[in-house]
């Protein structure tokens, strides 16, 4: 039986404008075929095909502002900031996996223990022949537990902005589970098409673990949840869906300040390196003459925001040229790097309702440190 790899680069202004369907099959070495679908502009490289053997990789690359423009805008503002997505290149994604193993980072341990207890209940909630979509995916034990608990899952769709990390994690899941794996290379914060799979799909479920929802401010978190709700309400192409879709999302609960801050200021400095890596990327990829040694990292609880805010603090006044401007970094000012919002269960239910989602079920650990919510569209 021949292997089929789907590789598509779809460029669009909006999904409704995509009117052209291009199908092109190209015979490659070792009996492997490539199918280019839903493409205005298609690009192939031999080295890409080698690592994708046996997987279907779907690439959705919407027209976006140049990254340099985004960085420039963040650094000329009254409060300097950088896009949080800059953390997640291949090295950044690997560093985040290391963070999840740290002693101080309680979130992963507590969530994993909770998932061991509730995975069967989640599997029952999403039902048979469900397509599981995981934005910002990783080859984690949490995902393994859920896939193992799901009755006859139809497919697994990991979505990630880091292409190399996506392929590695997708291959790991494919090795461990007898399920069709359809990796999607995309920015999961932007709406994108859901791939079709070979099996009949009765429903879709989005799995968003690890308190990643907390990395968005309240407005952006609501927008993201609305996007998820739209994705699970859409009918699969075969029209077989008979169950309402679900959004299964984890969030970190509010707790003692010192404990929350320690989770983001680890003694080994992995979280600091996670942030310094962004400075290195700007220097290497955008030729912005920033030096990591001119900054120090610190994460603090900001009560009025209900969030841990991670910042790089300027150690010495210095200036750099960027996009025709000279940007000055004053000693003592900070670059806002990332935020990690915490919620009480009631606060999160209110956020879900504002996103047109209803809370169907909520699970927490015994101490109430971490929660997993099962949501469904309010209209379902």
Please describe what each predicted stretch is.
Residues 216-227:
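A short, conserved alpha-helix within the catalytic core of class I
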Residues 321-380:
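C-terminal lobe and adjacent flexible extensions of AdoMet/dcAdoMet transferase-like proteins
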Residues 83-84, 96-121:
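Class I SAM-dependent methyltransferase Rossmann-like catalytic core
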Residues 261-341, 353-354:
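Substrate-binding/catalytic lobe of Class I Rossmann-like enzymes that use SAM or dcSAM, i.e.
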């Amino acid at each position: 039986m021949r292997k089929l790899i789907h590789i598509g680069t779809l460029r669009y202004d909006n999904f409704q404008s995509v009117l052209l369907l291009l199908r092109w099959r190209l015979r490659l070495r070792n009996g492997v075929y490539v199918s280019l679908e839903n493409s205005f502009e298609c690009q192939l490289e031999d080295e890409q095909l080698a690592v994708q053997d046996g997987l279907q990789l779907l690439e959705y690359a919407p027209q976006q502002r140049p990254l340099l423009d985004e960085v420039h805008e963040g650094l000329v503002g009254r409060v300097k900031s950088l896009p949080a997505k800059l953390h997640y290149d291949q090295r950044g994604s690997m560093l985040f996996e290391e963070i999840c193993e740290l002693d101080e980072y309680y979130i992963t341990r507590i969530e994993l223990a909770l998932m061991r207890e509730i995975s069967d209940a989640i599997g029952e909630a999403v039902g048979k022949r469900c397509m599981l979509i995981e934005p910002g995916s990783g080859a984690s034990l949490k995902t393994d537990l859920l896939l193992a608990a799901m009755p006859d899952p139809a497919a697994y769709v990991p979505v990630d902005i880091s292409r190399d990390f996506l392929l590695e994690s997708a291959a790991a899941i494919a090795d461990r589970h007898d399920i069709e794996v359809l990796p999607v290379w995309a920015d999961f914060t932007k709406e994108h098409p859901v791939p079709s799979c070979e099996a009949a799909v009765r429903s879709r479920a989005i799995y968003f673990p690890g308190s990643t929802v907390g990395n968005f401010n309240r407005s952006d978190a609501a927008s993201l949840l609305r996007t998820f709700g739209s994705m699970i309400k859409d009918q699969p192409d075969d029209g077989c869906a008979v169950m309402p879709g679900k959004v299964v999302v984890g969030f970190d609960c509010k707790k003692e300040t010192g404990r929350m801050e320690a989770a983001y200021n680890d003694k080994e400095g992995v979280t600091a390196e996670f942030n310094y890596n962004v400075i290195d990327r700007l220097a290497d990829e955008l030729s912005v003459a920033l030096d990591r040694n001119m900054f120090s990292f610190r994460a603090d609880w900001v009560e009025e925001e209900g969030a841990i805010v991670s910042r790089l603090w300027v150690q010495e006044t210095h200036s750099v040229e960027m996009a025709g401007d000279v940007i000055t970094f004053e000693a003592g000012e900070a670059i806002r790097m990332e935020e990690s919002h915490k919620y009480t269960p009631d606060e999160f239910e209110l956020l879900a309702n504002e996103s047109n989602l209803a809370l169907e079920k909520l699970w927490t650990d015994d101490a109430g440190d971490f929660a997993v919510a099962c949501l469904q569209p309010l209209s379902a």
